[in-house]
Amino acid sequence: TKRLESVNVKSTSDNRLNFRNTLFTSSAMKTCIGGVILYDETIRQEDNSKKIPEIISQNGTVPGIKVDTGAKVLANSSEEKITEGLDGLRERLKDYYNLGARFTKWRGVYSIADKYPSKLAISSNAHALARYAALVQEAGMVPIIEPEVLMDGSHSAEICYTKTSEVIKKCYEELISFKIDLEGTILKPNMILPGTNSDQKISSTEIAELTLKCLKESVPNEVSGIAFLSGGQTEIQATENLNQINLMNKSNFIFTYSYGRALQQSALKHWSKNINDTTGTQDVFNHRAKMCTLAAKGEWTNNLEKN
């Protein structure tokens, strides 16, 4: 709803389905996209009597589902958030599996400020992520673990590094205590960046260095898949930084992308001007997906953006 309203398109069920289906039937789905994280509404939608997960699967892509119910105010730390959605999750997971989902996503969210994230927020969200992951693996699906340290604020990249390390280490401490099979999980972290209001100027190389150092020190070796969130970066920034991380990667980790805005925004803007221009919208989306996929191999250059 927010995405459509941001480009002045009325957020009706039909319009949401139109945009989603435009992306889901693009050629990039076959060549670039490995999985799609759906919302509860989307996984139940149909287009021409075909369920959305079926359309996605037919294009060689795996349907997944966001299963948390959002971040609420954390008791005894009202400036912070705790993600909810554990109640009834076991039953919902059975339903989602039957609807075609094969992986899931749960997002913990953390703010950086003088005294935040607090130990309470870090431990509460890590515990919730571990309980979620245990239920998902029990249901025969792959859990995406998403502890997002937000870019909001004036903090430096070095502070982001310290706080993100603390958050991720606590997540794995809880995941291990819940006997999670780490090989059957995917981590969706933020990159190490200065806050959006920070004066710090930092290169893509420095971002990659800090991000790689943080993850090598905080993530167990059994975790093979790491898919970055874009977290408010522009399309080009998110692509360039992912590319640099892969160029400098000497670990066994596979680094890819799990982008929302940084994958869809240009396509959404194009579509909003004429929601029936399926081909034009798909061309824009195909280009962005190709750029991100090249970056996931360390093969992107800025010159390719002009073509």
Task: Specify the residue positions occupied by each region the protein language model found.
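Residues that line or immediately flank small-molecule/substrate-binding pockets and catalytic motifs
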Residues: 40, 108, 189
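Helix-rich catalytic cores of soluble enzyme domains
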Residues: 89-175
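Conserved, mostly hydrophobic/aromatic
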Residues: 12, 106, 145, 187, ...
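Hydrophobic residues within beta-strands of alpha/beta enzymes
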Residues: 36, 104, 143-144, 185, ...
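Proline-centered loop/turn at the N-terminus of a beta-strand
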Residues: 62, 142, 184-186, 225
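Short, histidine-centered active-site or binding-site loop motifs used for metal coordination
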Residues: 69, 110, 149, 191-193
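Catalytic core of soluble alpha/beta enzymes
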Residues: 151, 155-222
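Alpha/beta catalytic barrel-like cores
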Residues: 1-99, 112, 200, 204-210, ...
